């Protein structure tokens, strides 16, 4: 009899709970930024759930105006376009923050770049122009750690395609530098 009472009580609780109003918790929209370039605009949707430290770091540089009047300084068609760290005369901008911990193990596919030190990311970023799965996280060795993905292009892929096709050459010690600078006029948050 005791077990029947418990079962009836459990059913009553379940039924009663089903009458409570359901509260909708719509997910907050993902943050977006507009990269205004000399060749057009690119909108990137960021993923703070998968790469919170990387997104926070990137947005710090965005909001501080760090990227204003920098360039895409390395362009390799079939691979990526890299920017955010040099001015049009190829002077490297000084980073104001410490590198962030690499969040490459987040399950996203590669859209960002780093050196052989897995925790060296500061302000520079790149946008893949091909499926570069060899850059994805494989293990926690320097060569296998991968590159943290923190966003994706949602508008302006045609601009990315135009940038990846520019003529490039050498500039001092740098390779794959656009012969005509591709200016990042600004990067700003958008709704």
Regions picked out by a protein language model, each given a short descriptive name:
Residues 2-7, 14-191:
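Cyclophilin-like peptidyl-prolyl cis-trans isomerases
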């Amino acid at each position: 009899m005791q077990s029947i009472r418990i079962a009836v009580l459990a059913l009553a609780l379940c039924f009663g709970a089903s009458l409570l109003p359901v509260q909708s918790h719509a997910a907050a929209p993902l943050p977006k930024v507009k990269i205004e370039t000399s060749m057009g605009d690119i909108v990137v949707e960021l993923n703070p759930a998968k790469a919170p430290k990387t997104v926070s770091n990137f947005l710090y540089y965005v909001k501080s105006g760090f990227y204003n009047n920098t360039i895409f300084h390395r362009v390799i068609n079939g691979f990526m376009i890299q920017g955010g760290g040099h001015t049009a005369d190829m002077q490297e901008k000084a980073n104001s923050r410490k590198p962030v911990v690499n969040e490459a193990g987040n399950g996203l596919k590669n859209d960002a770049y780093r050196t052989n030190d897995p925790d060296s990311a500061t302000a520079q970023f790149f946008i893949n122009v091909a499926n570069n799965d060899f850059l994805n996280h494989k293990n926690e060795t320097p060569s296998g750690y991968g590159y943290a993905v923190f966003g994706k292009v949602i508008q302006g892929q045609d601009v990315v395609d135009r940038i990846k096709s520019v003529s490039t050459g050498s500039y001092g010690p740098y390779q794959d530098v656009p012969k005509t600078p591709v200016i990042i006029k600004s990067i700003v948050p958008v709704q």
